[in-house]
Amino acid sequence: MSELNQGCCAGHADGAGEAAEHGCCSHEAAGAAGAGAAKPAFVADGVNVAVVGATGQVGRVMCAMLDQRDFPVKSLRLFSSVRSAGSVVTWRGQDITVEDVAKADLSGIDVAIFSAGATASREYAPKFAAAGAVVVDNSSAWRMDPTKKLVIPEINADVLTAEDKIIANPNCSTIQMLVALAPLRKFGIKRIVVSTYQSITGTGVKAVKQLENCLIY
């Protein structure tokens, strides 16, 4: 269950670090709304959204992106392990209490964004799907599962159907590379040589703290 709060980059939601406790999504989205009147937190004709792993690094960024991209949210529910359950996250000026994913009623959710690590995704994603939600999973749990579709929206979103209840999100390096390479397929690609530099956050919050001890001041 500790994976529910582990921090990592969006393509590596399997981080082995400790939880970023009591995170606030609104901190990540500071200034995104710009000047003028505040946008409404929720819209009547929007989508009922859940973020699983909401107090971790990736979960907080997911909350921020929902705000920054003006996603039409009808309701927002935040889930974590029992360790962070009960904490309060502020999103668009609204205080939202984080729920214990192991005990919560999962009904009424349209889309569930999982940023909780592979173990948590394997355990809880099917339960969210069975309750009626479409799950978008950031971990490696379903990437190699032949029954699940691995989707990069800019490339192959058209493969999705109403029957797809758990959608796998590729590794972050894969996404960046294929968005650039997809238009070149028509020319015929024989071989690709790739060098990547991975973020330390892919290992988790603990690794970030360890790196700080190695920096020269």
Which stretches of residues belong to each language-model region?
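N-terminal Rossmann-like NAD(P) cofactor-binding subdomain of oxidoreductases
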Residues: S2-H12, H22-Y217
